[in-house]
């Protein structure tokens, strides 16, 4: 099995799902401390948002994607029946995490979870655009941050900095997904250049976070 193969069980899928699904909410969690809002990390919250983000990005998104795409392209995955069973277990875990953190930190957690569920409907016949996964990355950062602080009542400058980092996540993920799907775009040079430009533009918001 080649590393770059696509599908739920592909090594490439697992690695990239961890990078996006687990590390982006970790970034959000670290922001809360870096901005001086919290004095100690809510460790349980960090673990759960990283776990939830990883499961959502890897299992939720890819069971749905593989179910609709296994007859369209070659994918390293399970049977359709196994995918549905795995999807069911995945939903139980994710809903449990969302409910628990909502009880611990407030209703916005559930809103972020619902957004995550919607953007995971990534397949032909459903939603199928790079932007939706980019929005997922954006809200993973915001969600990770919120779980740490537990409130929306923060100074406007704090939210501006959080939004800057979230837009960095959005654009970097969008640019990466365009590059990842170059084969779907028949290796269009315009799409390749756009992905590079968007990824570079993401750095502007990363820099803004540190200079504001």
For each predicted feature, which ranges?
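Membrane-interface loop-to-helix entry segments
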Residues: 127-135
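Hydrophobic alpha-helical transmembrane segments
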Residues: 1-121, 134-212
């Amino acid at each position: 099995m080649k590393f770059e193969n696509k599908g739920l069980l592909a090594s490439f899928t697992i690695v990239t799902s961890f990078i996006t699904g687990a590390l982006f909410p970790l970034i959000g969690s670290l922001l809360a401390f870096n901005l001086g809002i919290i004095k100690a990390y809510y460790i349980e919250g960090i673990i759960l948002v990283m776990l939830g983000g990883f499961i959502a990005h890897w299992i939720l998104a890819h069971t749905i994607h593989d179910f609709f795409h296994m007859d369209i392209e070659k994918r390293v995955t399970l049977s359709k029946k196994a995918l549905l069973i795995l999807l069911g277990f995945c939903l139980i875990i994710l809903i449990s995490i969302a409910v628990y953190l909502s009880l611990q930190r407030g209703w916005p957690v559930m809103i972020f979870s619902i957004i995550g569920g919607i953007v995971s409907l990534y397949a032909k016949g459903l939603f199928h655009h790079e932007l939706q996964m980019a929005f997922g990355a954006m809200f993973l950062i915001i969600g990770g941050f919120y779980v740490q602080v537990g409130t929306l009542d923060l100074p406007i400058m704090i939210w501006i900095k959080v939004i800057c980092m979230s837009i960095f996540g959005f654009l970097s993920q969008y640019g990466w997904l365009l590059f990842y799907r170059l084969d779907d775009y028949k290796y269009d040079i315009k799409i390749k250049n756009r992905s590079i430009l968007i990824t570079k533009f993401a750095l502007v918001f990363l820099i803004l976070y540190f200079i504001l």
